[in-house]
Swiss-Prot record:
It comes from the Bacteria. Belongs to the GTP cyclohydrolase I family. This is GTP cyclohydrolase 1. SUPFAM superfamilies: Tetrahydrobiopterin biosynthesis enzymes-like (SSF55620). It catalyses: GTP + H2O = 7,8-dihydroneopterin 3'-triphosphate + formate + H(+). GO terms for biological process: one-carbon metabolic process; tetrahydrobiopterin biosynthetic process; tetrahydrofolate biosynthetic process. Its EC number is 3.5.4.16. GO terms for cellular component: cytoplasm. The keyword Protease does not apply. Zn(2+) binds at residues 75, 78, 146. Keywords: GTP-binding, Hydrolase, Metal-binding, Nucleotide-binding, One-carbon metabolism, Zinc.
Length: 190
């Protein structure tokens, strides 16, 4: 499979008018293969297993929020980068998940060919199914290089998507608290 991938990269280089045998490009096919292998490594992991591996009983019934989880992904339409951050909140219903598992789950979904809308839904759905909270809120803010580098070429434009479950939909106060917390200034001086 690696050889076929590298040959395809060589062919792309030829098609755009480059010489894949020139010094600067000799190792490019191998580098591109390794880069894509890493950037799509999310297909090799199950995010629900990651979450299930760190569930803990808890009497907490207040919002748990992790914000500014940075990620990068590849747009499934153009294979160009998506760079952004994710805010994830849930209200426990007898269980909490280890905090490190939330960004790990985000990385798993991000390291697949994606569209932002789908990734937002996948994160919310995985949390809802695995920890069965009273509610889940997910907001993703991202820049899309397919918008900035080609087509309309709108540099620094951002896209925001959200997915809400349970009490984040049904309870306006919960929803308002979530959006207020993710939009408040964050200073982390410890």
């Amino acid at each position: 499979m690696q050889e076929s991938f590298e040959n395809s990269v060589k062919n792309i280089l030829k098609i755009i008018g480059e010489d894949p045998n020139r010094e600067g490009l000799l190792k490019t096919p191998s580098r591109v293969y390794k880069a894509f292998k890493f950037l799509t490594s999310g297909y090799e992991e199950d995010p629900k297993e990651v979450l299930n591996d760190a569930l803990f009983t808890s009497s907490n019934n207040e919002m748990v929020l992790m914000r500014n989880i940075e990620f990068y992904s590849l747009c499934e339409h153009h294979l160009l980068p998506i760079i952004g951050r994710v805010h994830v909140a849930y209200i426990p219903n007898g269980k909490v998940v280890g905090l490190s598992k939330i960004p790990r789950m985000v990385n798993i979904y991000a390291r697949r060919l994606q569209i932002q809308e789908q990734m937002t839904e996948q994160i919310a759905q995985a949390l809802a199914e695995v920890i069965e909270p009273k509610g889940v809120g997910v907001v993703v803010e991202a820049r899309h290089m397919c918008v900035e580098m080609r087509g309309v070429q709108k540099i620094n434009s951002t896209t925001t998507t959200s997915a809400l479950r349970g009490c984040f939909i049904k309870n306006a106060d919960t929803r308002r608290e979530f959006f207020s917390l993710i939009n408040s200034p964050q200073e982390t001086h410890f």
